[in-house]
């Protein structure tokens, strides 16, 4: 039995609130159960130096957590003077995932930065950031199209992510912190709405996982992510 009482294939309650902040071109509050992340999309003219003259745009991401997003206070990374390895790994994952959603050639000389700020963490912060970050980015792109600043829609497909794992010998989807901290296997899956995989990050924590367990986890991820695509579409159409 999962600590939350959920079935193995049951996600937490998912909620995406659009236009959550005032100033950003796109913004959402995304909630995976008790995990809550604010995702904002900022549009700027120009691209990084390494892309100048390439006639394309750029999408990147930054990730951070409030000091009391967790059970005990974490020192702000700004106060330490540098970002931690976990933070860098997660924001690179978010950036890679969201770049895979767009044709950068269709947004020349435009950069979009997705800022993902975790205000409450209960497992799955990176997957929530990717899922909410896509909606914030898509909303910003829709604004550019409406203003005539983009001629063609660069979005190729939706992108969303979810965690899966093996908990007490059973493959489960969308792990909360209690499950994640005790799971025998922990995996994050990023997919497109065309059933393409963007990233699969899986680690055996206690014991190796079998090919049957891997298949079961990927099936659970696909089912869960399809639910996320429905939630994304509903909020984008609202």
Swiss-Prot record:
Q: Which domain of life is it from?
A: Bacteria
Q: Which family does it belong to?
A: Belongs to the RNase PH family.
Which EC class does it fall in?
transferase
| InterPro entries documented for this protein | ExoRNase_PH_dom1, ExoRNase_PH_dom2, ExoRNase_PH_dom2_sf, PNPase/RNase_PH_dom_sf, Ribosomal_Su5_D2-typ_SF, RNase_PH, RNase_PH_bac-type, RNase_PH_CS
Residues engaged in binding phosphate: 86, 124-126
The protein's annotated catalytic reaction(s) are: tRNA(n+1) + phosphate = tRNA(n) + a ribonucleoside 5'-diphosphate
The job of this chain, per UniProt, is described as:
Phosphorolytic 3'-5' exoribonuclease that plays an important role in tRNA 3'-end maturation. Removes nucleotide residues following the 3'-CCA terminus of tRNAs; can also add nucleotides to the ends of RNA molecules by using nucleoside diphosphates as substrates, but this may not be physiologically important. Probably plays a role in initiation of 16S rRNA degradation (leading to ribosome degradation) during starvation.
Stated EC number for the protein is: 2.7.7.56
Its subunit composition reads: Homohexameric ring arranged as a trimer of dimers.
**Where does this protein come from, organism-wise?**
Hahella chejuensis (strain KCTC 2396)
Its protein name is Ribonuclease PH
Among Gene3D superfamilies, the record links this protein to: GHMP Kinase, N-terminal domain
GO molecular-function annotation terms? Answer: 3'-5'-RNA exonuclease activity; tRNA binding; tRNA nucleotidyltransferase activity
Keywords, alphabetical: Nucleotidyltransferase, RNA-binding, rRNA processing, Transferase, tRNA processing, tRNA-binding
Name one process (GO BP) from the record: rRNA catabolic process
């Amino acid at each position: 039995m999962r600590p939350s009482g959920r079935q193995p294939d049951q996600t937490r309650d998912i909620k995406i609130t659009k236009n959550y902040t005032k100033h950003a071109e796109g913004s959402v509050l995304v909630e995976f159960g008790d995990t809550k992340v604010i995702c904002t999309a900022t549009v700027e003219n120009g691209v990084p130096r390494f892309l100048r003259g390439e006639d394309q745009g750029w999408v990147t991401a930054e990730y951070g957590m409030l000091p009391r997003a967790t059970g005990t206070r974490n020192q702000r990374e700004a106060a330490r003077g540098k970002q931690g390895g976990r933070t860098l790994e997660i924001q690179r994952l978010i950036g890679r995932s969201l770049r895979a959603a767009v044709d950068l050639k269709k947004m020349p000389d435009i950069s979009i930065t997705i800022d993902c700020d975790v205000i409450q963490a209960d497992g799955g912060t990176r997957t929530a950031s990717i899922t909410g970050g896509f909606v914030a980015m898509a909303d910003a792109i829709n604004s550019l199209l409406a203003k005539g600043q983009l001629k063609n829609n660069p979005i190729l497909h939706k992108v969303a992510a979810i965690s899966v794992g093996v908990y007490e010998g059973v493959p489960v989807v969308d792990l909360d912190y209690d499950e994640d901290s005790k799971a025998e296997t922990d995996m994050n899956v990023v997919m497109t709405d065309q059933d393409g995989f963007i990233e699969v990050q899986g680690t055996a924590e206690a014991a190796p996982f079998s090919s049957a367990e891997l298949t079961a986890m990927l099936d659970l991820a696909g089912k869960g992510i399809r639910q996320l695509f429905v939630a994304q579409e509903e909020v984008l159409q609202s």
